[in-house]
Amino acid sequence: MPVVWPTLLDLSRDECKRILRKLELEAYAGVISALRAQGDLTKEKKDLLGELSKVLSISTERHRAEVRRAVNDERLTTIAHKMNLSLYLGERPSYSMSGPNSSSEWSIEGRRLVPLMPRLVPQTAFTVTANAVANAAVQHNASLPVPAETASKDGVSCSDEDEKPRKRRRTNSSSSSPVVLKEVPKAVVPVSKTITVPVSGSPKMSNIMQSIANSLPPHMSPVKITFTKPSTQTTNTTTQKVIIVTTSPSSTFVPNILSKSHNYAAVTKLVPTSVIASTTQKPPVVITASQASLVTSSSNGNSSSTSSPISSTVAVTTVVSSTPSVVMSTVAQGVSTSAIKVASTRLPSPKSLVSGPTQILAQFPKQHQQSPKQQLQQVQQQTQQPVAQPSSVSQQQQPQQSALPPGIKPTIQIKQESGVKIITQQVQPSKILPKPVTATLPTSSNSPIMVVSSNGAIMTTKLVTTPTGTQATYTRPTVSPSLGRVATTPGAATYVKTTSGSIITVVPKSLATLGGKIISSNIVSGTTTKITTIPMTSKPNVIVVQKTTGKGTTIQGLPGKNVVTTLLNAGGEKTLQTVPAGAKPAIITATRPITKMIVTQPKGIGSAVQPAAKIIPTKIVYGQQGKTQVLIKPKPVTFQATVVSEQTRQLVTETLQQASRVADASNSSAQEGKEEPQGYTDSSSSSTESSQSSQDSQPVVHVIASRRQDWSEHEIAMETSPTIIYQDVSSESQSATSTIKALLELQQTTVKEKLESKPRQPTIDLSQMAVPIQMTQEKRHSPESPSIAVVESELVAEYITTVSHRSQPQQPSQPQRTLLQHVAQSQTATQTSVVVKSIPASSPGAITHIMQQALSSHTAFTKHSEELGTEEGEVEEMDTLDPQTGLFYRSALTQSQSTKQQKLSQPQLEQTQLQVKTLQCFQTKQKQTIHLQADQLQHKLTQMPQLSIRHQKLNPLQQEQAQPKPDAQHTQHTVVAKDRQLPTLMAQPPQTVVQVLAVKTTQQLPKLQQAPNQPKIYVQPQTPQSQMALPSSEKQPASQVEQPIITQGSSVTKITFEGRQPPTVTKITGGSSVPKLTSPVTSISPIQASEKTAVSDILQMSLMEAQIDTNVEHMVVDPPKKALATNVLTGEAGALPSTHVVVAGMTKCRESCSSPSAVGPPLTTRKIEAAGVPTTGQFMRIQNVGQKKAEESPTEIIIQAIPQYAIPCHSSSNVVVEPSGLLELNNFTSQQLDDDETAMEQDIDSSTEDGTEPSPSQSAVERS
């Protein structure tokens, strides 16, 4: 037959492919539809479809999709249903007969291999409108009959049969389709039928809720989702970013926000925050871009899904969400700045919770919260501090704290001044300690304010931009050992918040909060404590506690001495308070590990008084908050702790009891000797005697044995763990005598012996290395200092020995040896790092030196080493007499090196001298940064990087023993003019690193880098000579060392040491957050600890070394100098995140005895302290005590004796100097977990160092 049309068309190959594929798909779809209409799927049909799918190239997924299409096709379903009914009548072949359930097999066949993951409801600009429409439709549909009931007129049979399949289908689809409801059960509250409320409230929350409701499967739709909170949220337009942070009261401290957060669709973001929150004891607060979100955190306790009962809570949890760890939420609690930072850094580990201040700053800006109620837009919020203030009571929070009933939801205030946003919130749930309430003074925008929030276990401080510094005094209710629970009443929580540069909130009672871990030392019952913080812009956390009342139960143990406390008023005028000999200083407990306590005792007030004031024993209790349980299990290495004098023991016992009343209560009360389960190894009360007299008594109480304690539950919340610093500042003689003597006797035969033993500490944990002491070793300025120096040197020697030699095995002096061994066990012995004994001498500087202990381990180390050097002429050979200071500098370097070793993983603790020069530090800081980074990598600390010291120095570190001088040269390069320092540094490049650390953790304060401009800041970090025999190169004549000059920049404090100004002694000890992290690790595995101990020890050492001679005077107070202190922290890089804070706060302000103008430096110091602790979540131990062991793990307490002299800092905050206070730092932080994790790494490093090459300190000692 003729073809009438063309048989070949003008089709390309691609077109043909497409048409063919279409035909295949349509054919397969047609077959499926036909088979579906016939009835249920049978084996024959399956086989047929299997062959057909091969012929037509139909994939399994497409096959299933087609089946699902057919199953959900109501036409086909109706046909199959009708046909199946007729099957029973025998009208069709039996093979197709499937009965009423004609879709069961088809449904099974169409199931997805991988169920769809439920998705969060997307949020768009139209979400609110769409939700409103959807809600209207839902309401309308609710009045209509169920769809299954509408179709069948024959009804019963049809509806019955259809209904099951339909329901089944629906169920399947709902499970496969994203349903937020399941994930966010809490979010949906069937409070009312209408969902409209949320819309009016905070759009974000309501949107999320509504979207969740909309996404719910139809069968669930009858449940109305109503959010009460939306009404609260309405004020907040900024909520756009809102992430709901919900914390249920139950979540309390550790509970993950996550669990809470799942309630909301937004949860995913929140979850991260919740994690952080969980790390923190308190209900996590997410710092939201808007103030409101903070509020929500506080409201978390309500558990109401409304995230922001008080303000729009949604606010910007984004920040938090950005950091899964949600440091933010922690922050909300207490961690606030530091925590937030960490969150951004790493969500997963609480330890990272603490992060460098810089990070926080970076995050804060974005978080700037808007006043809970106001600014729609975050940006506005950022710009408008004031608005936020009004909405949150926080401005007045301080007063509020006492006034507010526990029930008060925490008010959160976020201020953003310099780019740091401070959120203060009060915690409402009882589980959250009342103390969590943090007051930030938003009043001044100029100076940064630290806001401290404490979660149960953690206390966090943030810098608030408020310029004004204020003192807050609160009375703390009498606290019983069970004080911990006091948290319910905000009043009970003692917070002090300082607005100036940094404000610290101290919530001793709250410490006890369940936060689980937090052990807070009890505060003297019935006494009023003044806590002031120096407004250091750069340091996020500093706590200064001054106890007005003479008595503090905790301090009972200390011998009664007259203590002079100086309070620096914002005005810069100083008030001196004398406390009766019996009086004890208040104990400050920081729930957050980051916080550092600075207890300053006026050194210069009177020479006569000084000696007594000099000693500030410190006890730190670390607890891990992240875990509900207290991680602080002491290894119980029985340790020299027993040796501690009775007084010390009493103190410890009291402290422990108080602390124990908190979660840790269980064992804490035991005696110190027992190693308080509290695991605060405090170097027992007499950490160091700074008495001028060359009093032998070493404040070192190595009670720290408990330090060794393992923290079983490290993982969760190293960071969260609160740190309590217990500082006992009492007359040097008594305190030194009781505790120190016991320890001394045990620990040191002679300073020298200690030095010898130092070499023992081959193992230096990187983390310990991370703690640079460099800064601390400021030259003692005045000749007067010599006598002090002597006393100190002995103490230092002890400390150094403890600290320096992690390996303790070699320590010559038996007692020391035991200590060292203990340390080895605890791994922290060295780190315990003695509290810096105060360098009592004439100038208040001595007290500052105590601060050395300050977290900035560098400083601590440096000071320590300096002390060693200063120790006395006693320190033999290595000593160098510093003409300016009149101190002998000796191998103080050793300790420094140890610190360095920790840091660098080289055994260069000795180098602790951290090139005193701030400039050097700063300059090197960048270089150091790299080094630190490497270190950090080891330590897993992110903060260090900035600090990396110059590599040159680092290289020298390795070469250290071989070429001390070259190192010095490097230092010189850095800008250090002083060779002597350089030599020390040179001896231990790591030391240099420490210095840089001293400079600051860059992260914490960007300004650190500024600091570098300062050329001559040296801390002469001479490691104590004894310790440093090797570094003996320590060499720098004290005279060479320049007086530290502290320049306090908003972010950084620069410390320059110049010999001339005796009064200024600044301990620049950046908190050694890194070290702390490691320490916790050490704590975790006591045995394992030996290596770990090295790290902890180093930290401790750095703490010890941190002391700065009182004589040293700061010439300039430059914010940039602060960086120095910060650097120290970075040096500690091991616990990098934490370190930042420490560093920032670290820099002790040098105060000039003579000039109030010195105020600036002290401020810096304080800041550093504050920053250090919270950031690190590190534990601060008393340097003295556990220097070697107890402190080991989180050591890094900064105890600073701040001269009574008013120190006018930029922030002009009040500094309270508490000569004889016990500060107990309990660190229950995730840090410990970190430490555990890092411990292994660090241990490896340490062991490598130990095994492979003796640390410079060791070598030095051996040489000696």
Swiss-Prot record:
Which Gene Ontology terms of cellular component type are present?
Answer: nucleoplasm
Q: Where is the composition biased (Polar residues)?
A: 660-671, 1254-1264
* Compartment(s) of residence: Nucleus
Q: Which residues carry this modification: Phosphothreonine?
A: T171
Bias-annotated ranges (Low complexity): 364-406, 681-698
Sugar-bearing residues? S192, S200, T235, T465, T470, S521, T1069
> What GO molecular functions are on record for this protein?
identical protein binding
Signal peptide segment: none
- Residues of the region (Disordered) are 145-179, 364-407, 660-700, 1232-1264
The record describes the protein's role as:
Regulator which is able to repress transcription, possibly via its interaction with a multiprotein chromatin remodeling complex that modifies the chromatin. Its interaction with BRCA2 suggests that it may play a central role in the DNA repair function of BRCA2. Mediates ligand-dependent transcriptional activation by nuclear hormone receptors.
What's this protein's name? BRCA2-interacting transcriptional repressor EMSY
User: Upper lineage ranks?
Assistant: Eukaryota, Metazoa, Chordata, Craniata, Vertebrata
